[in-house]
């Protein structure tokens, strides 16, 4: 059997590579214009020496992939760039593609991907679906199980028939029940808080309290990834101890540092450097997952969204789903996120339900790609893919209606 090509087409970052790789290649899914008007595609962003006032454009807007003109250039950068990745796509006609797309993709937009894959790149076959649909096929022991009291137990390998996948990415957070490998779209819920929202809120908070950083997208994203954490117990508990968790971030001076860094204890401060002292900002911003009212968003938080999702599945499955929650997506790299989710959800559930959250041991952003890798070795993949000859015979409408569209499950 041929080794398929896996592409986890995230809105922030594309994870891609042949299925025989242990870890994927990674490329940012964006086009960046620096303050001098020069354009940098994908990972070329790392070559920018002055990160101030950079403008970033992404192919995805409001969770939908709407700009294939830009996305195709980024795919070319990924697939035909041996100088950076040490690998390139040779003959796409002999390559099978497994790709991801966002949940509830509008059918007309979903057809665009079919046309690009089969008509522009001419792949031999394709299988695409949301990342959550691949997760139950992950048989590797890459998870820690966090219980409702915060305890951690060893994960067991094997296919799980009932899982509640919480995919928290850059655009938003999806909560999707997957029952025997089939997504239960009737109960799928969306929380409009993701990495992009956290960046925006952190910008506003720092600009109001310290310096104007509304045009410093790259800097703020770096501060979020290095410094922010979820309150392990509660917001009020962390607020009382904010002095203990205070962080001093040395802002870039574009001579000794291009993106800034966290000052370590007893580390000398350069005389010409500016210091950003962060206290409650570090945990107030991630806390919006559980309490959106902090940012004046009058919508349910993550726990309420999960409970609403669970209430829409058959009653006999509800405790099974709650005890098999899988946390994937880059936002679960935020410290204490999965543990806090388990404890908060346990308080809201009936006493005879046991909440368990499966947390990736390493990088949660890569867990979707690793699940796709496991899926590529199953008979389910062989039976569900669409070949190029089938596409040319039936057309894009047939692919969306009978194979890839979510409407057939509703």
From Swiss-Prot:
GO molecular function: nucleosome binding
SMART domains from the UniProt entry: ACTIN (SM00268)
Cellular component aspect of the GO annotation: cytoplasm; cytoskeleton; nuclear periphery; Swr1 complex
GO terms of biological process kind: chromatin remodeling
Superkingdom to which the source organism belongs: Eukaryota
SUPFAM superfamilies: Actin-like ATPase domain
Record bears the keyword Transcription regulation: yes
Keyword terms of this UniProt record: Activator, Chromatin regulator, Cytoplasm, Cytoskeleton, Nucleus, Transcription, Transcription regulation
Assembly: Component of the SWR1 chromatin remodeling complex.
Family: Belongs to the actin family. ARP6 subfamily.
Protein name: Actin-like protein ARP6
Gene name linked to the record: ARP6
